[in-house]
Design a protein with these regions (language model features):
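Hydrophobic, aromatic-enriched, well-ordered structural segments
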Residues: 1-11, 193-200
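A short catalytic or substrate-binding loop motif that flags glycine-/basic-rich loops and adjacent residues
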Residues: 1, 208-213
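Extended alpha-helical scaffolds
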Residues: 60-180
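Conserved SAM-binding loop
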Residues: 219
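Short Cys/His-based metal-binding microdomains
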Residues: 3-60
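Long, compositionally biased intrinsically disordered terminal regions
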Residues: 121-166, 183-186, 192-198, 203-205, ...
Length: 378
């Protein structure tokens, strides 16, 4: 086994130090540290630096020139807001240009148009909207004009909200910054009261954007009946910090990120439940599901996905489409990338079934299914 890579970043000066052989700085290891700090602060703990870091600091202090007028944290925050505002203004120009050209003409220019716009937003410290544009670039030929129009509409709503952010409530302002990609410090979240409950792992989503892998884990509280979302990131092939197997349960407190309709949480000290989980009650009607989704949007219009537990629904073929049918005869389509329809059909045997899914306002992405032996991947 080779020697472990030693990598460190000094955030105040942007100095990267790494023992790898890469000639370019910052290297992949330094960038991975920055991405982890930005998107997965719960994976970072505060401790005294190891000896090799202190030796690097000592050498730097001996050779460093005096630094004056270091900007305070508030000044750096205002500088970032100014940079983000310039990115929002550029995004508005691009969206207005797309509106003039039309979606069909924009699509004819290929996905590089969206990728270039996403790169500019990333430079402006707006990774949230940049991710929306990258997903548009990755839709490929299966993407519809309706999907693109909706995504662009969400981005324009973000632009209008950003221009009037001073008029928003504190919670709405926090959610706007979270959508933009500005994360709340882990310590600040943990200082808020936690919600104690018995939590069941209902579904897991894994994905990747360039070399950064992400994971969404949905939990549901037995007593509170609230959903909690855990978001993890890992660079390259590195494993996630903790495993969250489907259908396992944990006792403990989750701490929600600030917001008027909070979903994302931190679960600092989960304890294996070791007992049955009770209390799953779901929608039998898509009408009721949509009504509650619309209520949620009135609190937080930036909901990327909405967790739903459905009962007495059936996967069927309807006019050559693969859909889900509720007790009232209403149908809803599956997510374009969903590939396990025939698995659902086999599990249901043509009869009613229960499943957990993410809903985006138009389509469902099943994540797990209830069987006689419990929850299984959907």
């Amino acid at each position: 086994m080779g020697k472990a890579i030693e990598s460190a970043v000094k955030l105040t000066t942007g100095k990267y130090v790494c023992s790898c052989r890469a000639r370019q700085r910052p290297c992949a290891h330094g960038l991975a540290l920055v991405l982890m700090l930005k998107n997965a602060q719960e994976r970072i703990s505060v401790a005294q630096p190891p000896a090799w870091v202190r030796s690097v600091q000592l050498l730097a202090e001996k050779s460093a020139k005096p630094v004056t007028n270091v900007p305070a944290a508030d000044d750096r925050f205002e500088e970032r807001l100014a940079l983000m505002t310039s990115g929002v203004e550029e995004l508005e120009i691009r969206l207005l240009d797309i509106a003039r050209r039309g979606i069909a003409d924009t699509l004819a220019q290929g996905p590089d148009l969206f990728r270039a716009a996403a790169a500019r937003l990333t430079d402006a410290k707006l990774p949230g909207p940049a991710g929306h544009l990258r997903r548009l670039a990755n839709l490929g030929p299966d993407g519809t004009e309706a999907q693109i129009a909706r995504a662009l509409g969400d981005l324009y709503l973000f632009i209008r909200a950003w221009k009037h952010k001073e008029e928003l409530s504190v919670k709405q302002h926090d959610e706007l910054l979270q959508f933009a990609g500005m994360t709340t410090r882990k310590d600040d979240i943990l200082r808020q009261p936690g919600l104690q409950d018995h939590w069941l792992v209902m579904g897991v989503v894994n994905g990747q954007e360039e070399k950064l892998r992400f994971r969404r884990v949905w939990l549901r509280g037995e007593k509170s009946r609230r959903f909690a979302l855990l978001v993890d990131y890992a660079f390259g092939e590195r494993p996630f910090e903790r495993a969250w197997p489907l259908a396992t349960s944990f006792d403990g407190k989750v701490h929600y990120y600030p917001g008027s309709y909070p979903q994302r949480t931190i679960f600092p000290q989960p304890v294996p439940g070791g007992r049955p989980y009770d209390g799953l009650v779901g929608y039998t009607s898509f009408t009721n599901m949509r009504a509650n989704y619309q209520k949620a949007l009135t609190f937080n219009p930036w909901l990327y996905s909405y967790p739903v537990y459905l009962q007495e629904v059936r996967p069927v073929k309807h006019d050559h489409d693969k859909v889900l049918l509720d007790t009232e005869g209403e149908v809803i389509h599956f997510h374009a990338g969903y590939q396990n329809f025939y698995t659902l059909l086999a599990i249901s045997g043509g009869g009613p079934m229960s499943l957990f899914a993410e809903f985006d306002g138009y389509q469902l992405l099943p994540l797990s299914v209830v069987t006689g032996s419990g929850l299984v991947d959907g």
